[in-house]
Swiss-Prot record:
This is Multiple drug resistance-associated protein-like transporter 1. It holds the Pfam family ABC_membrane. Vacuolar multi-drug resistance ABC transporter that may be involved in the transport of bilirubin and glutathione conjugates. Plays an important role in virulence. Residues 908-941, 1465-1487 are annotated as: Disordered. It comes from Candida albicans (strain SC5314 / ATCC MYA-2876).
Length: 1606
């Protein structure tokens, strides 16, 4: 035989080895007509040359592989793994051993595995000696290398290394393939003799066992200590997500999961890692925008305008996570390539069947098995890459989520006051809950989006290969239809932007409502608050969702039609212009390609929508991050030294400083053209020309009327009010303004900021527990008696904002926090206003005086209290934002100015010392003050301190006594950020009554009843229509495919395109009907079902929450409630509907798919049923796992929101105490916990996906195998039917995976409904109105109040706060209510308004039992000026009269009576952004003034006193009420304003019954009667005169302690 014939026989042409060339496996013998005899000749040449690639098949018509070809593959495999193992062996040997590594004994599994590997070496060597084949030399070398590597890895690697895992798996698969041929073919590969065959079987089993031991039982020979979890996971476990199996088994067994059960698989997805990346990239982006590029410079030159480039958050994120973006895109491209390989493989498979049916010489059956195997392996490779792509994209999403959440939170803690005003807490919460979630969900499809252009190009190229130029007909159709669909999608942009703003506004309003729940109940304002919320939610937000839904339905119709239009146009053009029949091998691969084409086509609209959403969200976040911060040094004008200045007597110095409300306004200062002097608008000036100093060890007091600037000065010293920057035109001789502080600062705000924690945690506030000084602190702050009354003492959990505490208790806890820090400078803002007079007197003595606990520190006190002024070293009188008088106490009294008159007028009433007495007292030696001015406890403490000083001085010398005395009151040490204070207590194990209530989490499957309630809320009639329409669409789709199958078979049989007009016309008609039904279903589900359901649940939950008793707000963090109104509502608005739609569609598709397969391949029933058992095994484990993880995630998110909201509200306190890092650490810890849950949950999804896609690929594989098997039977499957069936079998992967995933998502969405329904069914207060028990309109006509054996408690398990109260308050009687802290004064108010309900007895008003009438009728007919004055982010008018019942004249009148008219007249606010956009001439919009002026969130543009006066104005409006309750109503105002208010009350409420709870006993001295409460009981009830006559009375002792009697 000549050389050329030899080459032809061996099949050297590389073209013949092409995967897609059908001739590669049909052998070239067919082409030359070579018979079996020649094939035998060929076999003689199989191993004749070592330089040629042998044929894969032994003969063109036989079903056996060529042994030479198999051996060549084996050699290549051995060579590859030998190199791979050698590389890893070298790496392990060069890796330095850890010195601290602890080695363990060798386990039996390791010994057995080594023995098996050694056996494998012997077996391979035996095969070599039996076969004398050089192939086995490579096998021996590879196995020996594996043996060495097994020995080394045991002591060096924590996991089974990759080369060994892959080698043994590949070796097992290869040996199995050889075993199959050796068992069923006469053309042997290894087993040319009986012993060789036995050794082959043993080698196969042995190789498999080694693999099992390596992958499942590997344990390193040392203890794993500091390795990250993922570093202990081997390759197979990582790619199959097997490392989650223990967790899944645990949840399946217990139906429960805790955070501690989760494996720590975060890796680098922690806040610290991710935030650092984004922060760095954002800083670079900010620098980039400050330096315009070439294009910007050219454009600026051409237009003569400055180009302002905004920093782009997207660019910063892209730069920070470039590696993850690149990996995600690469994996998406791989998935795309493998996906497009499937249609070509299907075509090869169908062509094999066609050749088998219509060719004379039938190809070997092994070729069919080959293509079935290749399709299976391609599918496996596809889903492995697919799941890794998903994992990467979700990891990217979580990295962005954690980084942005941390950045936003840290930014919120640094915002300037003006920025905080522009960006309310609700907006910031929305950025975290809404915007970041939108970005996160965009990331998980990012790879798909970015790979879409590639998919489109590859798909068109593939279609061109099938249809040639006819493809362009489809392309032209797409070009015509796609822009229309794109325009429809683009039209949603405006709606989405508005939707996000509506969500912001709704969240802000809900936050305000929750914060002001008690006031809303006092005023019975539930109805107007719900009306405001309903307007934003139903009329605006849901209306936008409805518009988006209608447009989405139209877009869905258009995009679903595009692939159909393309297929129609392509088929029609091909049939008309090309004389080639549309056979199954063209039609069904084309259908698969059209489906693949629909993916990028369908992704385009969602991509456009999501890009709009994401760009909006990123822009909003970027805008937040660009907001102004108030720098600590304020451009160098503020200097802070953390240590006292030993060379100066001053601790605080403010020189020539003017402070402004807004830096923005300051930056927009107008310039007078002539004088060129810049001025700050008067409305922006907060304080002007301030010169102030405070010395070490002295008390400086700042006094003034309400709104004069006392609190502003305190905040200015803190650095929270911007200092006015001198203009360039200022005279250089003018002094430069400055604020200097020397030493650490403690701040006690006027409105105490209390954490939702224990009392002890609030006092220690991140500092180390010092039992001795802690006891001194609580004693000095008068808290010991409170601790005795609180349910758990200082371990009592106080609730959100300290809601379970009285105003006085909150004030004293806040003061104790400041005192405990042992700071150098104390900034105290009106701390005495909320405490009783006798308590205030003790605090002055024990804390504020020079002999007090912080007497040797600098104290700056803004106050309206006159008694404390006697202790002051300096007194400043402030009015209109400027100091008008200043001096020491003696100087002020001698000057006899306004300040002296104030002191004389109000001071003499309280038995305060005269000027002479003060002078005399001030000359007395301090030692006597020590002995006479302190309680026994305090004296004992001081003696201990003196003894300690003496002891230390003995060692260091008398010359250092001063230093020692200063050092004794040392600064408090901080604890670690994660410190648990409960561990500091010896009794931390005892049962607490007020522990933090964990958010309830139900267990088990979400019941069908939950979904039933949702469907009923959505209107089941419309829902049924949608299901029917969807089912029709699925059936029509099956009909379309069968029509094409039937037509293509006719074309094959007749070798011509049969009746194209009829078949394509029918196909087009079915497509149009399907598209129309799709549109109608989408329109109905979005326009009617979803909006209706969302309206129902939000309305019901809002009403249920607002109608809940006050105990619900006491025990439930606001963040937890907000989570229901933001995340959970967001899920039922958008996520859950899509999930339900997808589930119904997928379920119906599944029924049809299995029906089609079983109709033509009945034997598949055995395979499908068997695999469905496996499928169910995974399903029943996955569903509880994802459900419980979702519940855990929902619970984990609430603390994140609660912590962020809580700390944003207390940002001034956090900043003052330098506690930012601690709160950031706490938030990071919570974010990382939430992220871990999310990462585990998504990896569990991948765990399921890997297994279900294996099942799906197996179904496809067995379908193909059974189809090949039918070729040897009586009824072989036709190529057209094969294409029809395989098209459906290839979709099983998607269907099965989607069914479980979507069902799990439905369960997760069901959890959201479950949580909402839980809040829809909260225990409610009594009915607002009881129709048959409504009192008369004139009730109460007299205002007689009777308590009859009345008792009450705040909650069922707590002790009573009022016990058997028995008293009568007559009509028009003025009753003052006093008592020590915790006596029950405020509880009496709550009882009267039925904020808390009776546990015994009742209250009657004018003979009507208040427990028998509706709450609206009760509260609406009572009037209160509450202790906590709440305002809403609305106009002055809406804050006064939310019902709109009164005229403007009436509103102005009550403002005048409340002494607010002047201030409100001057108020002005800019129009909102919405109003500007709605106006044609936004620049011409005037500012809102007077009643229309806006009150900002939390009343930030009003002082505390002004907010109290606003409450007085509200009370003055209610003229019909005959009962007025004043709950410490004038605590926050100065004495002059208090006098005016008291006079207003006497004149305007003279015909009303008045109950006054007051700290200042002088304000109730003119009351008709005094009610003294003690431990919740009536201790005394008589006229003040009679009570003062009795020196044994409690009232007498209170008056004496407060200095009101001689």
């Amino acid at each position: 035989m000549n050389e050329s014939n030899r080459e032809l026989i061996l099949g050297l042409s590389p073209v013949h080895l092409s995967l897609f060339n059908s001739e590669s496996l049909l052998h070239t013998f067919n082409f030359f007509g070579v018979g079996d005899g020649q094939a035998n000749i060929a076999s003689n040449y199989v191993t004749a040359s070592k330089f040629v690639i042998p044929q894969p098949l032994y003969s063109p018509h036989g079903n056996a592989l060529n042994p030479a070809f198999v051996e060549l593959i084996g050699q290549a495999v051995n060579t590859f793994f030998a190199i791979f193992m050698l590389f890893q062996l070298t790496r392990l040997l060069l890796t330095k051993k850890k010195s601290h590594r602890i080695y363990t004994p060798t386990p039996f599994s390791q010994t057995l595995k080594i023995s098996l590997v050694l056996l494998q070496v012997i077996l391979v060597a035996s095969l070599y000696f039996l076969n004398k084949n050089s192939y086995f030399i490579g096998g021996i070398a590879a196995t020996v290398l594996a043996l060495i590597l097994h020995l080394v890895e045991f002591r060096r690697s924590p996991i089974a290394i990759e080369s060994l895992l892959t080698y043994w798996s590949a070796n097992t698969a290869f040996t199995f393939a050889v075993f199959i041929q050796d068992s069923y073919s006469k053309h042997k590969i290894y087993a040319n003799s009986g012993p060789a065959y036995v050794i082959e079987i043993i080698s196969l089993v042995n190789s498999f066992l080694i693999f099992v031991f390596e992958v499942g039982y590997y344990k390193p020979g040392f203890e794993i200590t500091n390795e990250k979890f993922l570093d202990t996971v081997n390759l197979f476990s990582y790619f199959t997500f097997y490392y989650l199996q223990p967790l899944i088994n645990k949840i399946y067994a217990t139906d429960d999961v805790q955070l501690t059960d989760l494996p720590d698989i975060l890796g680098n997805i922690t806040c610290d890692d991710t935030k650092a990346k984004v922060a760095k990239a954002w800083e670079e982006e900010l620098k980039r925008t400050k330096k315009p590029g070439l294009v910007s410079k050219v454009w600026s030159f051409v237009t003569r305008r400055k180009v302002n480039s905004k920093p782009q958050m997207f660019l910063a994120i892209a730069k920070a996570f470039f590696d993850k973006f690149a990996i995600s895109i690469t994996l998406a491209i791989i998935v795309t390539g493998l996906s497009f390989l499937q249609p070509f493989l299907l075509r090869k498979f169908i062509q094999f069947f066609s050749t088998y049916f219509y060719s004379v010489e039938k190809p070997p059956i092994i070729i069919g098995y080959f293509w079935a195997s290749v399709m299976f392996l391609t599918s496996v490779a596809n889903f492995i890459a697919f799941n890794q792509a998903f994992k990467t994209q979700f990891d990217l999403g979580y990295e962005i989520q954690s980084s942005l959440t941390t950045l936003i939170y840290e930014k919120a803690l640094r915002l300037s006051p003006q920025s905080r005003k522009n960006k309310p807490t609700g907006d910031i919460i929305n950025h975290i809950t809404m915007d970041i979630d939108i970005i996160f969900w965009f990331c998980w499809q990012l790879g798909e989006y970015l790979a879409s252009p590639l998919k489109l190009a590859v798909c068109l190229a593939a279609l061109y290969k099938l249809f040639s130029n006819a493809t362009w007909a489809g392309v032209i159709t797409a070009i015509i239809v796609a822009p229309l669909a794109t325009l429809v999608n683009a039209s949603m942009s405006k709606n989405y932007i508005q939707l996000m703003k509506d969500k912001d506004e709704r969240t802000s309003l809900i936050t305000e409502i929750l914060n002001s729940a008690k006031s809303i109940k006092f005023y019975s304002w539930e109805k107007p608050m719900l009306a405001r919320l309903s307007h934003i939610r139903n009329d605006r937000e849901l209306n936008n969702i409805k518009k988006i839904g209608v447009v989405s339905a139209l877009a869905q119709f258009l995009w679903s039609c595009i692939p159909f239009f393309i297929s129609c146009a392509t088929y029609a053009t091909y049939a008309y212009f090309y004389n080639v029949p549309l056979t199954p091998d063209i039609v069904f691969p084309a259908l698969a390609l059209f489906d693949l084409l629909s993916e990028p086509m369908l992704l385009i609209p969602s991509f456009i929508v999501e890009v709009i959403e994401v760009s909006t969200s990123l822009a909003r976040i970027g805008e937040l991050l660009c907001l102004d911060e108030l720098a600590d040094d304020q451009h160098g004008y503020v200097k802070r030294d953390p240590e006292p200045n030993d060379n100066s007597i001053y601790s605080v110095i403010v020189k020539d400083a003017t402070f402004v409300w807004s830096e923005e306004t300051q930056q927009k200062q107008y310039t007078d053209e002539e004088s060129e002097v810049q001025e700050v608008p008067a409305s922006n000036v907060a304080l002007k020309n301030i010169n102030f100093s405070a010395r070490k060890g002295e008390l400086a007091c700042i006094v003034g009327k309400v709104g004069s600037g006392k609190s502003t000065l305190i905040k200015a010293i803190l650095g929270d009010v911007p200092i006015k920057i001198p203009s360039y035109s200022d005279d250089s001789t003018n002094p430069t303004p400055s604020v200097e502080t020397f030493g650490s600062i403690a701040y006690c705000p006027q409105n105490p900021w209390i954490l939702n924690g224990t009392v002890k945690e609030n006092i220690l506030f991140g500092h180390k527990y010092d039992a001795e000084f802690y006891q001194k602190t609580i004693d000095a702050c008068e808290l010991i008696s409170d601790f005795k009354n609180l349910p758990d003492g200082d371990q009592t959990v106080v609730g959100e904002k300290g809601i379970s505490l009285s105003g006085g208790q909150k004030a004293r806890i806040s003061l104790a926090r400041s005192v405990y820090t042992r700071a150098d400078i104390y900034l105290l803002d009106d701390i005495l206003s909320a405490v009783d007079a006798h308590v205030g007197k003790n605090i002055i003595k024990k804390v504020l005086s020079n002999e007090g606990l912080i007497g040797n520190r600098c104290r700056i006190l803004a106050t309206n209290s006159v008694p404390v002024l006697h202790e002051a070293n300096d007194i400043y009188l402030i009015a209109g934002g400027a100091f008008v008088e200043h001096g020491k106490f003696k100087e002020v009294m001698k000057r006899n100015g306004d300040l002296a008159k104030l002191i004389k007028e109000y001071g003499r009433k309280k038995d305060e010392p005269t000027e002479e007495e003060t002078t005399e007292a001030s000359t007395e030696p301090k030692e006597e003050d020590h002995s006479n001015g302190k309680s026994d406890t305090a004296v004992h403490d001081e003696l201990d301190t003196d003894e300690l000083v003496d002891e230390i001085v003995d060692y260091v010398g008398e010359q250092n006594r001063g230093v020692v005395e200063q050092a004794i009151l040392r600064r408090a040490s901080v604890v670690s950020y994660g410190h648990n204070y409960e561990n500091d207590e010896a009794d931390n194990g005892q049962i607490r009554k007020t522990r933090h209530e964990q958010e309830e989490s139900r267990k088990g499957t979400v019941p069908w009843d939950i979904f039933k309630q949702y469907i009923i809320a959505c209107d089941y009639k419309y829902f049924s229509f949608y299901v029917a329409a969807t089912f029709s669409v699925v059936l029509i789709s099956a009909g379309e495919k069968y029509l094409l199958s039937y037509w293509s078979q006719l074309n094959s049989e007749q070798n011509d395109t049969v009746e194209p007009v009829f078949f394509l016309g029918t196909y087009a008609t079915l497509g149009v009907v399907s598209g129309f039904l799709t549109y109608m279903g989408a329109l109905v589900i979005w326009s009617y079902c979803i909006v209706k359901g969302s309206t129902y649940f939000h309305n019901k939950m809002a009403e249920s929450v607002l109608r809940s008793p006050m105990s619900f707000f006491d025990t439930t963090p606001i963040g937890r409630i907000l989570n229901r109104f933001t995340e959970d509502i967001g899920k039922i608005d958008m996520n859950l509907p899509w999930t339900i739609i997808s589930f119904i569609t997928t379920l119906l598709n599944g029924f049809v798919t299995f029906g089609v397969i079983l109709s033509f391949l009945p034997l598949m029933l055995v395979v499908i049923v068997s695999l469905l058992f496996v499928y169910n095994y995974f399903r029943i484990r996955f569903v509880p796992t994802t459900r419980e993880l979702k519940r855990l995630e929902s619970i984990a998110k609430s603390p994140v929101l609660a912590t962020i909201q809580e700390s944003i509200n207390g940002v001034e306190t956090i900043k003052a105490f330098h506690q930012r890092e601690r709160f950031v650490y706490k938030s990071k810890k919570l974010i990382d916990e939430k992220t871990l849950i999310g990462v585990v949950q998504q990896n569990c999804n991948r765990w399921l996906s890997m297994r279900l896609q294996t099942i799906s690929s197996s179904i496809m594989f067995f379908t193909a195998l059974l189809a090949v098997v039918t070729l040897g039977g009586k009824h072989p499957i036709l190529p057209s039917i094969l294409g029809f069936v395989m098209t459906y079998s290839m979709s099983i992967t998607y269907i099965l995976n989607s069914l479980v995933r979507i069902w799990a998502e439905m369960q997760a969405g069901g959890v959201a409904i479950e949580r909402i329904i839980e809040y829809c069914d909260l225990p409610s207060e009594a009915p607002m109105i009881i129709e048959d028990k409504r009192p008369q309109d004139s009730w109460p006509a007299h205002g007689v109040v009777k308590f009859k054996k009345y008792s009450t408690a705040y909650r069922k398990h707590l002790d009573p706060v009022l016990r058997e109260i028995e008293l009568t308050i007559n009509s028009k009687e003025k009753v003052g209510i006093v008592g020590r802290t915790g006596a029950g004064k405020s509880s009496l108010t709550l009882a009267l308004f039925r904020i808390i309900e009776a546990t015994g007895g009742n209250i009657e008003i004018d003979g009507v039992d208040t427990s028998q009438i509706g709450l609206y009728d009760l509260r609406h007919h009572l009037t209160i000026i509450p202790q906590e004055a709440h305002t809403f982010r609305a106009s002055v008018r809406e804050n006064l009269d939310p019902f709109g019942e009164y005229s403007d004249d009436k509103l102005w009148k009550v403002l005048e009576l409340a002494h607010l008219k002047e201030h409100v007249t001057k108020m002005e606010t800019d129009p909102t952004e919405e109003e500007k956009k709605a106006s044609k001439n936004p620049d011409e919009l005037s500012k809102k003034v007077g009643l229309d002026a806006q009150i900002e969130e939390g009343g930030s543009n009003l002082s505390s006193g002004q907010k109290q006066l606003l409450c007085l104005a509200r009370a003055l409006l209610n003229e019909t009420s005959k009962i007025l309750v004043l709950d410490e109503a004038t605590a926050a105002v100065d004495f002059q304003t208090d006098k005016i208010i008291q006079e207003t009350i006497r004149t305007e409420f003279k015909d009303k019954t008045i109950l006054t709870i007051a700290h200042r006993i002088d304000t109730i001295m003119d009351s008709d009667k005094i009610l003294v409460l003690d431990s919740g009981k009536v201790a005394e009830f008589d006229s003040p005169q009679n009570l003062l006559k009795n020196k044994d009375s409690i009232f007498y002792s209170l008056a004496k302690e407060g200095g009101y009697i001689d």
